[in-house]
Amino acid sequence: MIKLESLQDPSPRKRRTKLLGRGPSSGHGKTSCRGHKGDGSRSGYKRRFGYEGGGVPLYRRVPTRGFSHARFDKCVEEITTQRLNALFSEGEEITLEALKQKKAIDKRAIRVKVIVKGDLEKTFIWKDANVVLSQGVRNLIGVA
């Protein structure tokens, strides 16, 4: 039978702390619940996350999935007409190298596409095959 005075708070904050190394009758004496020898018995020991006691850990047992295209992806950038107006002067030739020099695109870029945002206020020379014009830009400059 449960009596009122025998009820205990089950939460860990009310539990009495384990006194370690206080003699054999305490139940936590001698090795202080650490066992004999091994990493866990040493001071300062913290088990590494994912450590499985020397066995092959899960992250090495599970096969790698899929394939990454990161090494083979072609870097294609885009640039707006508004940005071209700000970067280049009237009659200047727009090439991939010129855009890289002005740091308008990534240095790894192999191609750049010009898209419409605002009007083209200046006339530019378009000769580079790696600078592709969108249909909207073609309509702006009058090239079919």
Swiss-Prot record:
Q: Output the PANTHER family linked to this UniProt entry.
A: 50S RIBOSOMAL PROTEIN L15, LARGE RIBOSOMAL SUBUNIT PROTEIN UL15M
Q: Tell me the protein family, please.
A: Belongs to the universal ribosomal protein uL15 family.
Its recorded name reads Large ribosomal subunit protein uL15
Query: Quaternary arrangement and interactors, per the entry?
Result: Part of the 50S ribosomal subunit.
| Keyword Phosphoprotein tagged | no
Annotated source species? Chlamydia abortus (strain DSM 27085 / S26/3) (Chlamydophila abortus)
**GO BP field:** translation
Question: InterPro entries, alphabetically?
Answer: Ribosomal_uL15, Ribosomal_uL15/eL18_sf, Ribosomal_uL15_bac-type
Q: Could you state a single Gene Ontology molecular function term?
A: rRNA binding
What the protein does comes down to:
Binds to the 23S rRNA.
List, alphabetically, the Gene3D superfamilies matched.
Answer: 3.100.10.10
SUPFAM superfamilies in the record: Ribosomal proteins L15p and L18e
Sorted keywords for this record are: Ribonucleoprotein, Ribosomal protein, RNA-binding, rRNA-binding
Transmembrane segment boundaries: none
